[in-house]
Amino acid sequence: MPKRTDIKSILILGAGPIVIGQACEFDYSGAQACKALREEGYRVILVNSNPATIMTDPEMADATYIEPIHWEVVRKIIEKERPDAVLPTMGGQTALNCALELERQGVLEEFGVTMIGATADAIDKAEDRRRFDIAMKKIGLDTARSGIAHTMEEALAVAADVGFPCIIRPSFTMGGTGGGIAYNREEFEEICERGLDLSPTNELLIDESLIGWKEYEMEVVRDKNDNCIIVCSIENFDAMGIHTGDSITVAPAQTLTDKEYQIMRNASMAVLREIGVETGGSNVQFAVNPKNGRLIVIEMNPRVSRSSALASKATGFPIAKVAAKLAVGYTLDELMNDITGGRTPASFEPSIDYVVTKIPRFNFEKFAGANDRLTTQMKSVGEVMAIGRTQQESLQKALRGLEVGATGFDPKVSLDDPEALTKIRRELKDAGADRIWYIADAFRAGLSVDGVFNLTNIDRWFLVQIEELVRLEEKVTEVGITGLNADFLRQLKRKGFADARLAKLAGVREGEIRKLRDQYDLHPVYKRVDTCAAEFATDTAYMYSTYEDECEANPSVDRDKIMVLGGGPNRIGQGIEFDYCCVHASLALREDGYETIMVNCNPETVSTDYDTSDRLYFEPVTLEDVLEIVRIEKPKGVIVQYGGQTPLKLARALEAAGVPVIGTSPDAIDRAEDRERFQHAVDRLKLKQPANATVTAIEQAVEKAKEIGYPLVVRPSYVLGGRAMEIVYDEADLRRYFQTAVSVSNDAPVLLDRFLDDAVEVDVDAICDGEMVLIGGIMEHIEQAGVHSGDSACSLPAYTLSQEIQDVMRQQVQKLAFELQVRGLMNVQFAVKDNEVYLIEVNPRAARTVPFVSKATGVPLAKVAARVMAGKSLTEQGVTQEIIPPYYSVKEVVLPFNKFPGVDPLLGPEMRSTGEVMGVGRTFAEAFAKAQLGSNSTMKKQGRALLSVREGDKERVVDLAAKLLKQGFELDATHGTAIVLGEAGINPRLVNKVHEGRPHIQDRIKNGEYTYIINTTAGRRAIEDSRVIRRSALQYKVHYDTTLNGGFATTMALNADATEKVTSVQEMHAQIKKS
C-alpha cells in the first residue's frame, strides 16, 4: 500500500524538556520523523518546547512551534495550522499524554484531525494497567500478580493479596517516576502516597516482586498488513528490580537458547497484534524466572522509546524513520534499507555480527542526601554505548567511554582494608551506580562466580566474562611491561583493554604502551555496522573499532576532511546543547564540501545518526581511540570546542601528538581556564573582577578570605557545571569545605572569589574570526548571581539592563576575544552591581546557551562558528550584525528534584538542571509565562502566598507583597518578614516556622493552603532550617521561588495569558528580517 493521499499536513508532538527518563533520544526520533515525512511531500508542523533540539531548527519542519506541550496551546496551533493528522509516537510519554488529552477534550474531533501511528485506544490499552492485564490473559501470556489502587485503602487491600516485597508503579508516568519497591508496610505507605500524587490519573499498579528475574526487551516493528519484524533483542545485565533505563544492557540477548528466543519473539508479535499497534515501533519487556523458566510480560510501550533509540544505533535500522513512513500507509516491504543502499527491503530483520553494550551514567554527586541505590525508579541522566566483537571488548570500551575516571575495571576498594569484603558484599547486594566495578573487586577478593551470583542474580555467563578479565589483569601486573609480547598484547587488546588501563597495571605511562603497539604494528581495524552481518555491501560509513585482520574503513584520500569530537554520555552540565552544536558543525561543513567525520559514543543523540555526518565512528571519546581514528583518516582539522569538557580536556594531548586542532588553540583555551594566566590577561585589559585569590592550602585560604571578605564562592579550577562549587559565609564554613570537598582537584589549586550578592548575572555568546567579533546575544539572568548560569532562567533581549551597561559588555567581549585570540565561539559571563560591570569568566568554546540564542535570533551560531574555524571569515559569510529581536525569548530550566526525595531543591552554584524550555512573547511577561507553562509549573493566578525572606531581601519584599495583593492574593509571612511588611502598612497572617510550634508552615502546605511560596535564605544555618519549606512545596506541588528576582518575574507573568497566542519560529525569524 503506497502512502495515504487523504492527508496533506501532519502535526508532530515533541517530548519537551529533557528530564530523567526522557532524554534526547526523542530529539533523534522527532528529527528523523520530520525528515521522513517531508521527503514524502507532507507539510510538517512541529510543536516542542525544548529549544536545544535539532528538530526545532527552522529547516526541519514547515512550521515549528517552540511552545508549551499543553493541550490548550496545541489546540491553538491546530486551529491555526489545520493539520489533517497528528503523530504522537515520537515524543515519549509527554506526547502520548498530550494526544490522549486532545482526544478527551474533543479537540481532534472538533478540527477533524486523525491520530496516526497509534490509536487513542491502543495507547490506552497499553498504558492502562488493568486493560493490559486482561489483554495479555486473552492471548495466553502470563503477567505478574497484581492489583490496581486509587486510594490508600485500596492499595493496602492489594498488598494483602500480593504480599511483600512488592513493586509499586503509578500509571501514565515515565522513567518509573514515583514508583519503588516496598519491603514492609511503612515503606509501602510512603511510596503509595507519593505515587498517587504523581500519577495524572491517581492510579497505582501494585505487582508481585520479580526481583532477581532476568529481564529482556524486544524491539518490534509492525505494519498495517501485519508484517512484523524484530529489530533487536536486548538483554538486561542487571536483574529485575533495577529500572531498565538504569541497567547495563546488551544486544543481542546473550543467554537465551534459540528455543527461548523464538518463544519470546512470537510472544512480542502477539502483544502488538492484541494491543492494536498497526504501524510503527514498540518495545515489549519480558521477565524470565531463572529457576523454572516462567515467562511473563512486564509491559509494552506503543511508541518510539529509549530502547528503540538504542536498537536503532545498535543495528543501523532507523526505527523512528521507518515508523513515520508506516504511519502514513507504507508497508515494510515497500521501504528500502538505506544502509545497504536499497539492496534489501526494510522487512529484512537486521542481523548483527558484534556485541553492543549500554551503560547508564549517573550524577549522584550533584544531589547531596539523595538515595543513590538503584530501584524501579529511573535515576540515570545519560548513557554510553560501545560496539565490540566480543562481550568483553564491548563492555570495556563502554566503561572507558563513560568518563567517570575509569579506564576499565579500576578497583574501587583496597584489598588491604579490613572492611573491604563487607563493603563489596553490601555493594553487590544493594546495587548503586558503581556495582559493575565492585563485581571485579569481588573476584579480586576471592569470591567465586556462584558467590557473586547469589548476591547479584546477574547471569553467571556475564560474571565468567568479568572474572576472566580480572585474571588477565593480575597476569599483566605480574609480568609487567617486559612481559607484554606481541601475542599477549594482541590478546589483551582484543578483549577491550585500554592502553591507559594496561599502563596502570604494568606501572608505566600510557604513552609507553602506545609506543609498544607501534613497535609491534598493532592497531585496531574498523568494521561497519551494516544491518546484515556483512551479507550485502554497504556504502554507509558507520564504524566501530576492533582488533582483527580486515579493515573495512576504506577512508577517502582526495577530500578535505574535518573531524568533530562529540560530548560522550549526557550528564548534568553537559547535555543535548553540546550535541546540538556538534551536529550543526557537521551539517555546515558538509554543505561547504568538506567530508565530515563524527566521533561519539552516546546512542541517544542526533550526532550519532548515520546520516548526520559523512562518516561516523561510534567510539569512546578518549585520547587512544581518537588518535587511532586520526591515524587512518588524516583529517585536515579536528574540532574540540563543541562537545563540552569531554573533547576539550583532550585538546593539549591531541596537539602534542601532532593532531591539527582548529579554531581557538589549546593554549588559548588554557589561558582562559588557568586562573593565573587569565588574571594577567584581565589586568592587561584593565577589566574589573570580583576580588579573588588562588590558594593551595587551608590556612592560606583562611588568611586570604579575611582580606577578600565573606561571603565567598569557592571552587576547584577546571570544572564544568559547577562541580564542588559552594558559597561560604564564614570561616567555619570555609574549613568544612576544605575538609569535605577539596579532594576534587588533584593538586590543583582552589579559587576564592568575593560573592557579589544581589548582582544581576549576564551571559554573552559571541563569535570571533580574528578580524571582528559578532555578538550572538546578550542574556540577562532572572535569578541573581550565585545561582549557576545553567540553572538560571534568562531573557533575550535583556529586560532590565540599560543600553549603556550592555554597550560596556559588548566592548569588553570584543577586547577579550582579541586578547585570547579566539577563533570560533566564546561565552562570557558578567555580573552587574550598582551599575558596575564585573567579569566573572570566559569560556572560549560552545556554551549551553548557543541553541537558545540561535532559536531566539535566527542566527545559527554553531554553523557560523564552524565555518569560521574552517577559515571562512564572518564578512565572507555575510554575518556581521548583532540581531536584537523585536520580541522576548525566555529560557527556563527543568530540575529533577522529584526523583531525589532527600535533596534540598535550593538553587546554588552547583548545576542540577537536566533540561530547558523556551517561551516567546511580545512582552517579557508573556514570554516568561509561556516558559513557566512549558516547564510544567503549577502557578495559579490567585490564592494565598507565603513570604519568608532573608535579611538582605527585606526592603525589596515590600514591593513584591504589594504586587501580590494587587493581583488578589492573600498573604502569610514568617515572623521577621511580617514585621517588615507591617511597618510598610501591609498586614499578613503570621505563620510559625517549623520549630515555633503548630500549626506551622509544613502543616499549612500539607493542607493545601498555599498556591505560591517565596522563600529566600542566606547562611548555612538558615538554609538547613528552611529546607523543609522547599521540600514540602515540591512534594505538594506548590509553585515556589527561592530568589526574589524569580518572585518578581513570576508576578509579572501572572497578568499574561500563556495560551492566548502561538507563533512559529519561521514567523518569529521573518519578523526579525522585517525589523
From Swiss-Prot:
Catalysed reactions, semicolon-separated: hydrogencarbonate + L-glutamine + 2 ATP + H2O = carbamoyl phosphate + L-glutamate + 2 ADP + phosphate + 2 H(+)
Entry superkingdom: Bacteria
Binding site for Mn(2+) 1: 285, 299
Keyword presence, Transmembrane helix: no
Segments of this protein annotated with the region Carboxyphosphate synthetic domain: 2-403
Limits of the MGS-like domain: 937-1075
One annotated GO molecular function: metal ion binding
Name of the protein in question: Carbamoyl phosphate synthase large chain
Organism, scientific name: Salmonella typhi
Higher taxonomy: Bacteria, Pseudomonadati, Pseudomonadota, Gammaproteobacteria, Enterobacterales
